[in-house]
Amino acid sequence: MPSASSPRARLAALAVAALAAAPLAASAQPKAARGRTEVTWYGHAAFVVTTPGGTVLAIDPWLSNPKAPEPGLAGKLPKVDYILVSHGHFDHVGDAVALAKRTGAKLITNFDLGSSLVAAGYPKDQAGMDTLGNIGGTIQAGDAAVTMVTAVHSSGYADDKGTAHPGGNPMGFVIQVKGGPTLYHTGDTDLTQDMKQLPERFGRVDVMLTCIGGHFTMDPKAAAIAVGYVRPRTVVPMHFGTFPAIAGTPEELRAALKGKAEVRVLEPGKPVGF
């Protein structure tokens, strides 16, 4: 056996030290500058966004809608950190209260609607001043910054007994993911001139989740004009086909865009990376 001071012993000691240090070096490596953000559509206007840092955002979580991929989703999602509600209508508030009670998710919406949802059972300690705001405000949600932006619609909230409550102003959401994409969820809205300002304020929008159904919101032709204002890389249509009245289709959107943007129709329940 070589002595501790021999060259062979010193080389062996160095090799062992290098092997021991290797896992530490690997774990200290920074994450990629642009990680994978997963977007899952659950039908209608309901989406779940999972960031590279593991933050989970549920947007307009009507998870029991007719286009949902399976029943009982509000009781099955393993983790939700924040629930974003664009306005007070039942098809956007959806299962927010039940989901919040089960997951502990904090509420991001306007202050008036937030107060009404707390009265309806949303846990008060999950709907505080740190996450309730109004149009123009930005909320830090883990590794995502959520800015509330203009939408033209209504926002009355009715509880389970049909009693009307304040719903504040309707809104869309611009979600800037650290190390990931910038997403724009239009909420329910008509075409607005404010959309022209989004690229100036937020830079390139990577993914625009846009209503196209018509009747209550933009139809495909109006949505195509909105896409021209926002200039996203990818357009994901939503809020169509759930009811007979919202009859706009992705095919009509593609035709109206004339190849000016990629239209990507998501399959309910299937995550897609951006």
Curated annotation (Swiss-Prot):
The keyword Hydrolase applies. GO terms for molecular function: hydrolase activity. Keywords: Hydrolase. The keyword Hydrolase applies. NCBIfam families: PRK00685.1. Belongs to the UPF0173 family. This is UPF0173 metal-dependent hydrolase A2cp1_1196. It comes from Anaeromyxobacter dehalogenans (strain 2CP-1 / ATCC BAA-258).
